[in-house]
Structures are given as structure tokens and as C-alpha cells.
Amino acid sequence: QIGCTRCIDICPTSAITPAGDHIDVDPYICAGCGSCAGTCPTGAITYSLPAGELLLKRLRTVVGTYLDAGGIDATILVHDSEHGEDLIGMMARVGDGLPANVIPFSVNETTQVGLDFLLSVFAYGASQLRLLVAPQKREEADGLITQVDLAAHVLEGLGYDEDRIKVLDDADPSAVEEHLYAIDKFSQIVRGDFLPMGGKTTLIRSALQSLHDNAPRQVNEIELPA
């Protein structure tokens, strides 16, 4: 019986193949985009450096420090160390730089983040999330976009507004800067303080519980898209 094939289907280089009850990842073909880890619903395949739990610990610290200092309307800007850092650097050199409430959050590949991270951004008290993807890697971002759409659907179902989260794949720093300065303000999300411990499903459950406890619309079920 064939199980979940999301990682196999989403891999842009076809580096993942079935191997009996498991899968096999060819390290010589793998491009390291992390889409497999991001789209995996259980954490059966993970991104090694950094591990998802460590990423969430850093996220919790970053958002918590900002809020403890009196910051409001926190926007987390997830970016990679190449396209994203270059874009932010250009904005600082030739533009106005990042708005004061935008917090850059560097990862190896933007496509490595999954539903556990996306939901935790808001569960820890951030108001907005933007994810920078290089235009040339747009084809690798299908898994990320699917997870973003799912997170937005859940946020909308709980009454938080789905427009709090977006993927940006523009190469023009001026366009990205203009977007960041024009972000609409939403109501502050009550900050959760759960520890990022356990596997991916546990982390998703913890984030959902925190969001549900303080949700404008505390429904018990949200119909998911097909």
C-alpha cells in the first residue's frame, strides 16, 4: 500500500525515490532546497541544519525579545543567505531600509520552513509574516506556497485574517521595500509562550492550541481545502 508521497512529488530534482517502506534521498542529486521537509506533514523527513525545533527556539526568542522591548505589529521577514540578504542590503544602501517593525529572519533556504514554523510565527505574537523567495527558485517554492495557503486558510478560519502571510518573489528591492512599508495593520495576536518541543505534529498542535485559545473565532473545526 502506497503511503504519503508529498516529498517525492515535490522534489524539484527527483532526488527522492521509494525504497520499500521508506524513501531514499540521493545526496548527489539533492539541491538542499528543503521543500520535502517543509511539505512533510509528520516530520518523517527533516532539514538537518538547523533542525525544525532549533529554528522555532530562535523564532520564539526573536519575537519574544521584540515584544518584551515594547515592540508592536511585528512582521517576520524570512529570507535566505543569498537572494534575501542581498535584497535587504540593497534596500539599506539605496532605499530607506527595513521598516522598524520588520524583523529579518535568516534561514538556509526559505523553502525549508513548514506549517509548524508558519503557525508558530503567529502563535508567538507576530502580526505578519513575509517570505522572500528568489525568482529563479520560484519553481522550487510550490511546496512552500501550498503550506502558506494552508496556514492562511487556518488563520482565516480562526478569525485572524488570511492576508497576514504572503510569499514575495520579486527581484526588485524597491518593490519589496514598498510592499513592506505598505503592509496593513491588523489586531495584535495574543502572545503564546509554549516551548518548541517534540516532533512536527506536536509543534503544529502546540501552535494551533495557542492560536485557538486566543482566537477571535474559536471554532472546533475548520474545513480544509481539497
Model regions: which residues?
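Iron-sulfur cluster-binding cysteine motifs and their immediate structural context
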Residues: 1-26, 31, 35-53, 226
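Ferredoxin-type iron-sulfur electron-transfer modules and their immediate structural context
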Residues: 1-10, 14, 73-87, 105, ...
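Flexible loop/turn segments at secondary-structure boundaries
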Residues: 18, 32, 39, 47-48, ...
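A contiguous, basic/glycine-rich beta-loop/short-helix subdomain that forms a polymer-engagement track
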Residues: 24, 47-70
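Short helix-loop-beta junction
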Residues: 91-103
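C-terminal structured domains
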Residues: 93-96, 113, 120
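Short, glycine-rich nucleotide/cofactor-binding loops
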Residues: 104-112
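Cofactor-cradling patches in redox/metallo enzymes
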Residues: 117-167, 172
